[in-house]
Amino acid sequence: MPESKYRQQTIRAPRGTVLTAKSWLTEAPLRMLMNNLDPDVAENPHELVVYGGIGRAARNWECYDAIVDALTRLEADETLLIQSGKPVGVFKTHDNAPRVLIANSNLVPHWATWEHFNELDAKGLAMYGQMTAGSWIYIGSQGIVQGTYETFVEAGRQHYNGTLAGRWVLTAGLGGMGGAQPLAATLAGACSLTIECQQSRIDFRLRTRYVDEQAATLDDALARITRYTREGKAVSVALCANAADILPELVNRGVRPDLVTDQTSAHDPLHGYLPSGWRWEEYQKNAQSDPHGTMQAAKRSMAAHVRAMLAFSKMGVPTFDYGNNIRQMAKEMGVENAFDFPGFVPAYIRPLFCRGIGPFRWVALSGDPQDIYKTDAKVKEIVAEDKHLHHWLDMARERIHFQGLPARICWVGLEWRQKLGLAFNEMVRCGEVSAPIVIGRDHLDSGSVASPNRETEAMRDGSDAVSDWPLLNALLNTASGATWVSLHHGGGVGMGFSQHAGMVIVCDGTDEAAARIRRVLHNDPATGVMRHADAGYDLAVECSVEQGLNLPMVAATQGKG
């Protein structure tokens, strides 16, 4: 069978209440798969690429067609199995089992390298699923905006007396993930200068209001930043250039930003990071003709990029890795002190993870933005005392452009996820919203990932690389009745550096859905509290006691068992 990764076809999820599949439990994954490939959502939908270098929704177009057909036919007591973007089986299970189980990009550890993966990919035997690309719950750049916003806000608290007014962030990358940075900085009160080597990505971010302005030159960009910071305005500026050139130049000029980070697709040197002096078309061509040489050229440029970040850090500028593994790539090219600046999780986010707080997201399958606005109001009603969360929801409504099906994200923890899910399900039952809602999350969450250079960097007990935790998370979500569950490898930081799990559950207004929601939206964040309590974090232990978790070894350690 010929296999095609390119098709000139526009995919959009159906809207409204007319079903293509046999129930909302199978209509939901069908619509979310299609939504991942909506041209307003995906970076390169004609090649099935959703975000993050080559993060795909399906292995090839033949597989996509087969997945759509299988979901359309799937019965209420059947489960579809997806192996690296390919539908490989439909099995009889039961009504409360997941309707889809997904495994993407998983390799035996010794073979978990980009070189081996690329060989398999070329043979049509594997697919890189990133995190939410291959698990069909990507919602565009909004999916990471609040996490980036929370990171910048916490950096402001730690370094600048609680405010980023009059400050500016230097970063790079305006792809599916990096595109969130300028808007997050603006919402946090800071100016930003984001370097991006592809004009098309800048154009997209300007069109969707994630970036305010584009500068013509570096001098122009710096003049704008100087003017806006002096005036106390939070304005985002993009510059079309290569970060491997611009950051060293800024160091040479003695320019001093207030925060430095990066969200280029450095995790994938073959497809995601343009070598200095190359054009993008040249990069794509060389990736096919000379993959090893291309990867080495990209990593040499990353080394220059990281040396500049280290120089900023040495100046006293708060500098952090935003989870793209650029430090690792630089270290492999001889930058021995690449890890002298921290990752964003140990620096700013881990206390949230200890309480099971992470990226809770939901999507209106109706396609009606009013359904999201009604759920926004419901969140404010239930989480009544959290004014920081209310402020986020207000800013999100004002500034965030929906991509594809309307969606929202807000970071909430173990205490609230189940309550919100049950409330959404009741809204569907009562007709307050016009169609069912799906609830999911990023794989970047407190209990669903092992990634020693990102989410689990510098764990208190040294368990950074232990990947039992995401496996247990996936197993528990399956046992709890999530609508679909995914287990991936390599997301965010690339092959060999992470394992992670995802889940999505449908709120269709039924009593059966409510029972599943009670289990899934408690157990899923509870695994994060469990994981951090097991690692010895007092905040997580306290949360486990408050929420009544049964953690035998933690209880024994605390003298309670």
Swiss-Prot record:
It catalyses: 4-imidazolone-5-propanoate = trans-urocanate + H2O. Its cofactor is NAD(+). One of its GO terms (cellular component) is cytoplasm. Its EC number is 4.2.1.49. One of its GO terms (biological process) is L-histidine catabolic process to glutamate and formate. It is found in: Cytoplasm. Binds 1 NAD(+) per subunit. The active site is at C410. Keywords: Cytoplasm, Histidine metabolism, Lyase, NAD. It is an enzyme of class 4 (lyase). NAD(+) binds at residues 52-53, 130, 176-178, 196, 201, 242-243, 263-267, 273-274, 322, 492. GO terms for molecular function: urocanate hydratase activity. Pathway: Amino-acid degradation; L-histidine degradation into L-glutamate; N-formimidoyl-L-glutamate from L-histidine: step 2/3. Its main location: cytoplasm. HAMAP family: HutU. Belongs to the urocanase family. PANTHER family: UROCANATE HYDRATASE. Catalyzes the conversion of urocanate to 4-imidazolone-5-propionate. This is Urocanate hydratase. It comes from Salmonella newport (strain SL254).
